[in-house]
Structures are given as structure tokens and as C-alpha cells.
């Protein structure tokens, strides 16, 4: 009897059938909550009178807290089980929502993002591992689609609430809080997917755990992975302000739509290409990401929202397929008790790429403006994509030579 069978047999048949859907929805909720503040940054900036640099700091502390969480508790669900860790993560995210609701200045926002980041880090590795436990092939696809879908829902949903509903700095967090409470209750009706094992205290020692059999693949994918997450970080921190400044559109839904276009396109493309092999999706992803970035730059320079959205949709397709290829390339290489640790290592690399370039972009935008910052950022991403192509070709040549 496998670990999954032994733990799941004590649960209801309904719980077993709904487990993948529940974990996917919970993952989407965490990432929707993480992107929900993005359309509110300009409102916060006006209400609390802070600079674009502080916007990126508020954005980035979330990622840094998430990294700390991954380093310390990223593998903890391999020892305690998936459900207890996800439950505590849901409770922590509720605390973050409460801090957002009470925020009356940037310090409250920073505190909320720190708690939210730690909660999301613990949840991301545990939920991701649970999905792969249930079905390695489908789990890898879901691990790609759910976060992207969640970020799109968070950005677009918040934008709509800001534009059409009252109390924009309150309502979105109240709605999210209700969802988190419901999921914290429902988690106990869902089957556990792994057995507890020894080594809990040792697992709390901060370290990046990449199984030897996955190291070469992860290294070859690193430049493209950095490019993917750097693009996502730029969108989720500065793009609403970029759209407003360069196009003159102040409607929150416009900026939110541009952000959502990236993740909606990414999630859709992941679903459409879910049965393709990683090499095929990488080729498509690299091509579309390059074309999309060039189109985005053109849209910024001619100050046309439709062109900007078109470029974003194209780049999003590249982002999603590259993300899918990375997850599908590395996760099957790990043993069941290595999955949470490997996923943590992948997310650490990803979220450093998500946050550090965005902070630099915040300083650049203050110094040279949003248009010039976009140009510099685009060049950097294209250079990373180019170096990634070279790294992948070199890796394939080594594999052929070793056969």
C-alpha cells in the first residue's frame, strides 16, 4: 500500500475526488491574495504619500518573507503532512488580511505583506507537493495554472472593486478573508497525501535542497526562469503606474487589465500546451516571450493601451509555457519525499528574480522615468532569454556526448 493510499483510505470518497480541485482552488486563493494589492498601490501612494521606491519595497518584502518561509519550512510538510502545514498557512494569511484591513500607513502594509509572504511560502510548497503526490503529471500542470489564475483573479477582481465598489481598501481583503476561513474548515475533509516521517527539526535548518538528479536541469533552466519571474515582478509592482503615466489612463480597471492579461494568457497557454513535451513548450515560450516584450516596449513608446495589452498577451503566453516547462522538467526528477524541498528551491530562485529586479526598477523609475525603465528592463530580460537558449543547447550537447 502506498503512502497516498494508506492516508487517503480513512477519508471519504467525496474528499478523495475533490482533493485536486480543493488544492488547486486554495493555491489560487493564496496567489490571488498576493496580487490583490497591485491595483491598490496607486491609491495607497496617494493616501499615504509615498514614492514609487516604497511601492516596490512593499511589493518585495512579500517575496523576501516568502523566501524565508521556503528556506525554513519549505520541506516541513514532508515530515508533518500536507494538511497541517496548509491549515496553519491559511491562519497566517487570515492575519495578513486583518492587517491590511487595519492599515493606515505604509508600515501596516509592510507588516501585512511580510505575514502574507511567510504564509504563501509555506502553502506553496505544501500544496504543490500535495498535487504532485496525487498525480505527478496533472499535478505539475496544476502547479503551473493555479498560481497564474489566482494572480489574474486577484489583479482583475481588485481593479473592478476599486472602480465600481465602495471601500476599495477594505472590500477585497474582507472577501479574501471569508474564502480563507472556508478553506481552513474544508481542509480537514480532504485526504492527506503523505505519511509523517522523522527529521522535522533537521528540516527547519535553512538550506536549499536540490536532489542531485535535478541539478543539471534546474541550472540549464535558470536564465529563462529568472527572465520569466522578473517580468512577472515588474508587472505586479509597477505596471499599473506605468500604464497611468505613459498612456494617461487613470481608470484602475485599465491598469488591472494589463496586469491580468499577463497571467490570464499564461494560464490559458499552460492549459492548451499541457500535453506537449517540455522541449516543445520551451521553444514556443522563448519565441513568444521575445516577441511579446518587443511589442510591450512599442506599446509604451506610442502610449497605446491596445498595443500594450497585445504585447502582454503574447509575453504571457511565453511566460506560462516557460513556467510549465520548468516545473514539468524538474519535479518528476524528485522522489516523493524530496518534492517539497525541490519545489522550495525552485521558488527561492523564482522569487529572488520576482523581487530584486522590481526593486531596482523602482529606483530607476524614480531616477529616469517609467518609459526608460521599461526599455532597460526589456533589454535585460531579452539578454537572459538569449543566455538561456545557449545554456539549454549546451546542456543538450552534454547529454548527447554522455550517451
Q: Could you say what each language-model-derived stretch is?
A:
Residues 67-106:
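Conserved MFS/SLC helix-loop-helix module at the cytosolic interface between two early adjacent transmembrane helices
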Residues 254-278, 292:
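Transmembrane alpha-helices of Major Facilitator/SLC transporters
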Residues 138, 142-188:
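Helix-loop-helix hairpin linking two adjacent transmembrane segments in secondary transporters
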Residues 49, 81, 102-107, 166, ...:
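Helix-breaking motifs and short loop linkers at transmembrane-helix boundaries and internal kinks
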Residues 280-326:
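C-terminal transmembrane helical hairpin of 12-TM major facilitator-type secondary transporters
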Residues 112-147:
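Cytoplasmic helix-loop-helix junction between adjacent transmembrane helices
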Residues 171-187, 374-391:
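Symmetry-related core transmembrane helices of the 12-TM Major Facilitator Superfamily/SLC fold
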Amino acid at each position: 500500500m502506498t503512502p497516498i493510499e494508506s492516508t487517503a483510505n480513512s477519508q471519504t470518497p467525496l474528499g478523495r475526488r475533490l482533493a485536486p480541485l480543493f488544492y488547486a482552488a486554495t493555491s489560487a486563493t493564496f496567489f490571488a491574495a498576493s496580487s490583490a494589492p497591485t491595483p491598490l498601490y496607486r491609491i495607497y501612494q496617494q493616501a499615504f504619500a509615498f514614492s514609487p521606491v516604497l511601492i516596490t519595497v512593499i511589493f518585495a518584502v512579500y517575496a523576501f518573507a516568502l523566501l524565508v518561509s521556503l528556506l525554513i519550512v519549505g520541506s516541513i510538510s514532508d515530515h508533518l503532512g500536507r494538511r497541517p502545514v496548509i491549515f496553519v498557512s491559511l491562519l497566517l494569511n487570515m492575519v495578513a488580511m486583518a492587517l491590511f484591513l487595519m492599515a493606515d500607513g505604509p508600515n501596516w502594509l509592510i507588516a501585512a505583506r511580510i505575514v502574507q509572504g511567510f504564509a504563501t511560502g509555506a502553502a506553496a510548497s505544501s500544496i504543490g507537493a500535495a498535487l504532485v503526490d496525487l498525480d505527478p503529471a496533472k499535478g505539475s500542470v496544476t502547479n503551473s495554472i493555479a498560481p497564474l489564475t489566482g494572480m489574474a483573479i486577484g489583479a482583475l477582481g481588485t481593479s473592478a472593486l476599486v472602480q465600481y465598489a465602495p471601500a476599495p481598501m477594505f472590500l477585497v481583503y474582507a472577501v479574501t478573508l471569508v474564502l480563507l476561513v472556508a478553506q481552513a474548515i474544508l481542509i480537514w475533509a480532504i485526504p492527506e497525501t503523505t505519511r509523517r516521517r522523522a527529521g522535522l527539526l533537521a528540516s527547519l535548518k535553512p538550506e536549499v535542497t536540490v536532489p542531485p538528479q535535478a541539478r543539471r536541469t534546474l541550472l540549464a533552466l535558470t536564465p529563462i526562469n529568472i527572465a520569466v519571474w522578473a517580468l512577472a515582478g515588474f508587472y505586479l509592482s509597477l505596471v499599473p503606474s506605468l500604464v497611468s503615466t505613459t498612456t494617461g489612463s487613470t481608470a484602475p480597471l485599465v491598469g488591472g487589465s494589463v496586469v491580468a492579461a499577463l497571467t490570464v494568457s499564461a494560464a490559458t497557454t499552460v492549459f492548451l500546451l499541457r500535453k506537449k513535451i517540455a522541449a516543445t513548450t520551451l521553444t514556443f515560450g522563448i519565441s513568444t516571450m521575445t516577441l511579446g516584450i518587443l511589442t510591450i516596449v512599442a506599446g509604451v513608446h506610442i502610449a497605446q493601451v491596445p498595443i500594450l495589452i497585445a504585447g502582454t498577451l503574447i509575453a504571457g503566453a511565453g511566460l506560462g509555457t516557460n513556467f510549465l516547462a520548468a516545473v514539468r522538467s524538474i519535479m518528476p526528477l524528485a522522489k516523493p519525499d524530496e518534492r517539497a524541498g525541490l519545489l522550495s528551491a525552485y521558488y527561492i530562485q523564482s522569487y529572488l528574480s520576482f523581487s530584486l529586479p522590481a526593486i531596482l526598477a523602482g529606483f530607476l523609475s524614480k531616477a529616469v522615468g517609467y518609459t526608460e525603465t521599461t526599455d532597460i528592463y526589456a533589454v535585460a530580460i531579452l539578454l537572459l532569454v538569449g543566455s538561456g537558449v545557449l545554456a539549454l543547447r549546451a546542456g543538450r550537447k552534454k547529454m548527447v556526448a554522455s550517451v
